[in-house]
Structures are given as C-alpha cells and as structure tokens.
Curated annotation (Swiss-Prot):
GO terms for cellular component: cytoplasm; ribonucleoprotein complex; ribosome. This is Small ribosomal subunit protein bS6. The lineage of its organism: Bacteria, Bacillati, Bacillota, Clostridia, Eubacteriales. It comes from Clostridium kluyveri (strain ATCC 8527 / DSM 555 / NBRC 12016 / NCIMB 10680 / K1). InterPro entries: Ribosomal_bS6, Ribosomal_bS6_sf, Ribosomal_S6_plastid/chlpt, Transl_elong_EF1B/ribsomal_bS6. GO terms for molecular function: small ribosomal subunit rRNA binding; structural constituent of ribosome. The gene is rpsF. One of its GO terms (biological process) is translation. Keywords: Ribonucleoprotein, Ribosomal protein, RNA-binding, rRNA-binding. It comes from the Bacteria. SUPFAM superfamilies: Ribosomal protein S6. Binds together with bS18 to 16S ribosomal RNA. Belongs to the bacterial ribosomal protein bS6 family.
Amino acid sequence: MGKYETIFILHPSLDEEGYKANVEKFKGVIENGGGVIENVDIWGKRKLAYEIKKVNEGYYTLITFNADPTLPKELDRVFRITDTVVRHIIVKDEK
C-alpha cells in the first residue's frame, strides 16, 4: 500500500448538506476500494487564484489515505464524472 493525498475543490453553490454528501461519497470510494483514510482536512470556502469553470471560489478539502496503486485511478474517475468537482489532484506521498 502506498500513501496518497488528494485535494479537491467543490463548487461554491453547494449547501452544507451537499458539500458533506460529496465528501462522504469520495471517502466511500476510498474505503470501498480497500483504502484506509488517515486524515480529512476541511479547509472551507476559499477564493481561487484564477477563475475555473466560471467560478472564483470553492470548498477545499484534503484527504490523506493509504491504498493499493489501482485505487487512485478509480478515485480520479469518480472525480471526473462528478459535476460539482471544480478541480482535483491525487499525488503519491514519497516520504
């Protein structure tokens, strides 16, 4: 298992329920894929450095997890098909 971090930005038009539902959805993908979540860090609503998809702000969330090498591909697929995701990145922690 490798250690990974993902940061994703959700659309600012979401209410608190919608935001929490999306975070739980992504956590579920990690856990159902055999991953172990180490930390969920909610940064909250922040201004973007530049406009993305016609929005200037979004809800930032960082998740640190351990998983097999195939899980990040599935998580990336779920991020891509979720309309409320403005931007995301998954990186392997080399520490």
